[in-house]
């Protein structure tokens, strides 16, 4: 004859009931959204990209470089799409070290759209020293470092 342990049966029942919400949470499908940037012909929201550049310029640029991008990239289709005059003004707001001149000296000049984004640090060692031993990643290749980027 089989004896039933009521306490064990009751605890087993409670365990099954407590696992039920976990099972139902796994079965929920994510909401499907039609993103504007989905697919080969997708586009990004221009105003959103311009705000993103503003955030980079005001916050991120104090530590992070974008050494693989030129100022002219800000005016390209699919990017922030600033006008040619805006790109020139953005580039000119930076002092770029150039040269050497005819005397062999380096000099500074206003930036041009063809210039690469100015780095906040002169070299890797200065960037590492200014950030407690950690080198801030370059923001121009950050997307490629992410899954699906």
Predicted regions and their residues:
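N-terminal secretory signal peptides
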Residues: 101-109, 113-115
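Thiol/selenol-based redox catalytic cores and closely related redox-interacting motifs
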Residues: 109, 113, 123-149
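C-type cytochrome heme c attachment motif
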Residues: 54-66, 118-122, 135-144
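Post-cleavage N-terminal segment of exported redox proteins
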Residues: 2-43
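Electrostatic cytochrome c docking/interface patches
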Residues: 29-54, 65-84
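Short, contiguous pre-domain boundary segments
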Residues: 30-40, 115-124, 129, 140
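Active-site-surrounding "flap" and adjacent substrate/cofactor-binding loops of secreted or lumenal enzymes
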Residues: 76-104
């Amino acid at each position: 004859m089989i004896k039933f342990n009521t306490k064990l049966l009751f605890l087993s029942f409670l365990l099954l009931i407590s696992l039920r919400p976990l099972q139902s949470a796994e079965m929920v499908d994510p909401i499907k959204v039609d993103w504007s940037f989905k697919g080969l012909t997708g586009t990004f929201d221009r105003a959103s990209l311009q705000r993103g550049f503003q955030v980079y310029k005001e916050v991120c640029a104090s530590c992070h470089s974008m050494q693989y991008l030129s100022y002219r990239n800000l005016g390209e289709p699919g990017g922030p799409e600033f006008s040619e005059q805006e790109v020139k003004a953005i580039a000119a707001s930076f002092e770029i070290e150039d040269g050497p001149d005819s005397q062999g000296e380096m000099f500074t000049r206003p930036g041009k759209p063809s210039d690469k984004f100015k780095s906040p640090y002169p070299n890797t060692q200065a960037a590492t020293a200014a950030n407690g031993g950690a080198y801030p990643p370059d923001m121009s290749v950050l997307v490629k470092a992410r899954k699906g980027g």
